[in-house]
């Protein structure tokens, strides 16, 4: 393989878009402790980026970007774990793949924030190396399942209904050209602590499985259906991180907001608006109101195009 100069924009790269849970229902728990879920996962334009910069004697990683500080580029990093898992699998199935590379992770998304950052980075690494090694994308999903519950849906990187522990993926409704605002208060939330609070608060609620249409024509149509759903982890996360309530109230008060909700196990929250332009305008208002708080915000549209980018 010929690698371009590391300063060239032609260096092989893949984007790791933020995953948003428009709803998240906890439906059961397996004997091994893993929770079962039913969730509608979509992706925002906001993204990390993984780049292959040069051949290397071993898989290696550097991390930069606004949220790169404090992240370890060690063997436990999901980017390196994904690279080595695919290297081992591909070397077995298509023969003799022993190339190693230096990878760069540009970390633009907050960490431990409920938007699948580490999982998305892992999935982007799988897609990137699969392209370089001519590995079929379908072969990535069994590897993704070993790396984390959110990694398979991030490999697909398109609107998807997730069930099971995240390994059962089904088509989602076609999304409207709605606007999306993401807000993170700069506070990390422990997912295990949130699940413990969920269990302490009463745990699983029996409910009918939400009906999802084939398509939503407008943001208003989408929100009408989402209003019949919830995020079961929102209240437990609030008990662990009360500022989430402040964020949700701030989003809900913005002009044009149709729905405010927390994503995943928090602490990132989102607002849905009628158009990307409305979301951007609302973000300007919120940034002026919260400038001293240091909140991270992003506004724009949904990422629709799937895993190839």
Curated annotation (Swiss-Prot):
Gene3D superfamilies per UniProt: 3.30.230.10, GHMP kinase, C-terminal domain
Leader peptide range in chain numbering: none
Pfam families per the UniProt record, alphabetical: GHMP_kinases_C (PF08544), GHMP_kinases_N (PF00288)
Entry binding sites for ATP: 110-120
Keywords attached to this entry: ATP-binding, Isoprene biosynthesis, Kinase, Nucleotide-binding, Transferase
UniProt entry tagged with the keyword Kinase: yes
A GO term for molecular function: 4-(cytidine 5'-diphospho)-2-C-methyl-D-erythritol kinase activity
Catalytic residues (UniProt): 19, 150
Enzyme class: transferase
HAMAP family: IspE (MF_00061)
Protein name: 4-diphosphocytidyl-2-C-methyl-D-erythritol kinase
Gene, per the UniProt record: ispE
């Amino acid at each position: 393989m010929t690698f371009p100069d590391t300063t060239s924009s032609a260096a092989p790269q893949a984007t790791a878009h933020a995953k948003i849970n428009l709803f998240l229902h906890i439906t059961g728990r397996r004997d091994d402790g893993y929770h079962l879920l039913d969730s509608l996962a979509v992706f925002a334009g906001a993204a990390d980026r993984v780049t292959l910069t040069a051949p290397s004697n071993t898989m290696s990683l550097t991390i930069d970007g606004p949220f790169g500080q404090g992240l370890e580029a060690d063997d436990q990093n999901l980017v390196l774990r994904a690279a080595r898992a695919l290297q081992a699998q591909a070397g077995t199935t298509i023969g003799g793949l022993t190339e190693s590379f230096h990878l760069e992770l540009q970390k633009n998304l907050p960490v431990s924030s409920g938007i699948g950052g580490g999982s998305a980075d892992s999935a982007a690494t799988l897609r990137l190396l699969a392209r370089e090694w001519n590995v079929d994308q379908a072969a990535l999903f069994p590897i993704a399942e070993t790396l984390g519950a959110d990694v398979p849906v991030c490999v697909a990187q398109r609107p998807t209904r997730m069930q099971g522990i995240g390994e059962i993926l089904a088509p989602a409704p076609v999304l409207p050209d709605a606007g999306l605002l993401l807000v993170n208060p700069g506070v990390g939330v422990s997912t295990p602590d949130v699940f413990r609070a969920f269990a302490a608060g009463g745990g699983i609620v029996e409910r009918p499985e939400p009906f999802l249409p084939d398509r939503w024509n407008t943001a208003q149509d989408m929100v009408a259906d989402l209003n019949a759903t919830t995020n079961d982890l929102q209240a437990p996360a609030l008990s662990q991180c009360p500022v989430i309530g402040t964020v949700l109230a701030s989003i809900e008060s913005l002009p044009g907001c149709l729905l405010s909700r927390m994503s995943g196990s928090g602490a990132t929250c989102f607002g849905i608006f009628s158009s990307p332009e409305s979301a951007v305008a609302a973000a300007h208002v919120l940034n002026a109101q919260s400038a001293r708080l240091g909140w991270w915000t992003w506004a724009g549209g949904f990422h629709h195009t799937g895993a190839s980018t």
